[in-house]
């Protein structure tokens, strides 16, 4: 079961987003992570008192099954009742039960930057009480560093590197999307900005993120999710990797694809770290735009120039070709909607967040702000893929030139 859940507004953290100086990002991230860790730790006496204050005459399994039926938007309030409920809601067993009952929900997290503020902040897409889609700030999470890389594993997001002033960050932060708590993880050996990152076989591979690649063994670092240890991987590296900041990256068929300024690279961890040299002879870079996502091991991206006659195209890694995503309703979307937007896989559908105001002409259709388009995909005979606009909503309105930095989805 895939839907967008109604959730309460979590934006009141006592901070005015217009007054967050960029130089406080690192400090605030660490402070929030430390605060979240401290909140999870209770004195032994207090924990015992909490456990004594709530008595359950029914088995734990039945309690878990009952809680699984409750909307996830009510979990934050329920977790504050006692340590029992806090631990239950943070447990993996509860979400396995929700999945087994067909109650899992897909959530979209977006990094939104306001015109006069730095950096971006986390927002979550939800449906309000009148069934309209809205973006609501998640105030308990730290700001999003510019140029960071984000990967999702289960119900967690890993925020890697980024830029603070002119300094490349070595940090990696774990965000638990079940509880909106975060904590710091071991740092990388090198600071990275606009690095490529992907998860293959329980390991996070982080590649590049430097101005220029130096002849050392730290161009690729790997984080083992079990041991929580970083490891540097030696070369050889492809000659085309001199410029190592990537505007987009994706994982398809357990291979990490990277879009550079001049070349595309493909790294294969399962083949002893081999590089697919044949990708240089394919049209991959011709149409790959930073607004992209992967659905069923195929790369979808926007094409504002409509090279193949349609605004969205899809790359098939097996035959290494681009094909159009057909559909009359896609033509109703203005071309400038795709120019500064982000795309995500929302339970097999495409979600695109973007501005409905042209940065060039100032043209605007409808309410100014961030708009969300939901596109249903259909595979037809002959391998053709068709798209149908399922909904188009203004999700964060009445503000000019909002910027969507990234968006991620995960199922909880």
Swiss-Prot record:
Entry keyword set: Kelch repeat, Repeat
Top-rank taxon, per record: Eukaryota
InterPro entries named among the record's database cross-references: F-box/kelch-repeat_ARATH, Kelch-typ_b-propeller, Kelch_1
Bias kind Basic and acidic residues: ranges: 16-26
Spans annotated as Disordered: 1-55
Kelch repeats: 156-202, 203-250, 255-291, 292-345
Keyword Cell membrane: no
UniProt name for this protein: Kelch repeat-containing protein At1g19470
Organism: Arabidopsis thaliana
């Amino acid at each position: 079961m895939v839907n967008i859940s109604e959730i309460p507004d979590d934006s009141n953290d006592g901070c005015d987003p217009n007054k967050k100086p960029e130089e406080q990002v690192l400090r605030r991230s660490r402070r929030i992570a430390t605060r979240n860790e401290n909140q999870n730790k209770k004195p032994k006496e207090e924990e015992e008192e909490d456990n004594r204050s709530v008595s359950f005459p029914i088995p734990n399994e039945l309690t878990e099954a009952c809680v699984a039926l409750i909307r996830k938007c009510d979990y934050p309030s329920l977790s504050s009742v006692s340590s029992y409920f806090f631990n239950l809601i943070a447990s993996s067993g509860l979400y396995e039960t929700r999945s087994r009952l067909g109650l899992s929900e897909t959530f979209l997290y977006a990094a939104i930057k306001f015109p006069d503020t730095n950096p971006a902040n986390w927002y979550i897409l939800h449906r309000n009480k009148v069934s309209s889609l809205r973006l609501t700030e998640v105030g308990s999470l730290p700001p999003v560093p510019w140029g960071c890389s984000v990967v999702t594993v289960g119900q967690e997001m890993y925020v890697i590197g980024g830029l603070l002033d002119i300094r490349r960050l070595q940090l990696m932060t774990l965000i638990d999307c079940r509880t909106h708590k975060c904590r710091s993880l071991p740092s990388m050996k090198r600071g990275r900005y606009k690095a490529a990152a992907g998860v293959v076989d329980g390991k996070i591979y982080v590649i590049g993120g430097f101005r220029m690649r130096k002849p050392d063994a730290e161009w690729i670092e790997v984080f083992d999710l079990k041991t929580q240890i970083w490891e540097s991987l030696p070369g050889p590296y492809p000659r085309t990797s001199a410029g190592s900041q990537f505007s987009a990256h994706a994982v398809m068929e357990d291979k990490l694809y990277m879009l550079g300024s001049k070349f595309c690279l493909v790294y294969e961890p399962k083949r002893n770290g081999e590089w697919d040299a044949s990708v240089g002879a394919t049209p991959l870079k011709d149409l790959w735009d930073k607004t992209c996502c992967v659905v069923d091991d195929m790369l979808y991206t926007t094409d504002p120039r409509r090279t193949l006659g349609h605004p969205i195209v899809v790359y098939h890694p097996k035959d290494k070709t681009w094909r159009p995503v057909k559909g009359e309703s896609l033509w109703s979307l203005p071309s400038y909607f795709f120019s500064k937007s982000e795309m995500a896989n929302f339970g097999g559908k495409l979600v695109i967040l973007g501005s409905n105001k042209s940065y060039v002409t100032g043209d605007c259709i409808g309410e100014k702000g961030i708009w969300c388009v939901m596109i249903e995909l259909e595979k037809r005979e002959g391998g053709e893929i068709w798209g149908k606009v399922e909904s188009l909503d203004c999700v964060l309105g009445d503000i000019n030139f909002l910027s969507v930095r990234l968006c991620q989805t995960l199922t909880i």
